[in-house]
């Protein structure tokens, strides 16, 4: 299982901790240190669409108007912190966030 997020993200840390506690092998990928390539980003955008960008974040609000009007891939490439997180890959399945439905899906296995 791979978690895409930020080392400093409290929700990412919580997800990683809970998954490891359940005995699930987790690889954490900090998207600032190792940005998503174009193919990975395109796959996530196909799966999650505009939900992949956290428009409530301070980082999003700090984007200039041109970037705010751009597509999600341009926004995330320019400022990876605007990506909603965590994104979790479990085999062929992708999950966004760490809400109850994601936890049930991943922790019930």
Segment roles from a protein language model:
Residues 31-109:
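Thiol/selenol-based redox catalytic cores and closely related redox-interacting motifs
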Residues 1-22, 26-32:
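Local sequence-structure signature of Cys/Sec-based thiol-disulfide redox active-site neighborhoods
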């Amino acid at each position: 299982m791979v978690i895409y997020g930020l080392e400093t993200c409290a929700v990412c840390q919580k997800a990683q901790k809970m998954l490891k506690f359940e005995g699930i092998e987790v690889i954490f990928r900090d998207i600032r240190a190792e940005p998503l390539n174009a193919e990975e980003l395109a796959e996530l955008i196909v799966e999650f669409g505009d939900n992949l960008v956290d428009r409530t974040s301070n980082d999003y609000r700090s984007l200039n108007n041109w970037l705010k009007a751009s597509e999600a891939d341009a926004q995330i490439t320019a400022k990876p912190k605007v990506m909603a997180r965590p994104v979790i890959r479990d085999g062929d399945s992708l999950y966004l966030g760490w809400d109850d439905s994601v936890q049930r899906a991943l922790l019930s296995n």
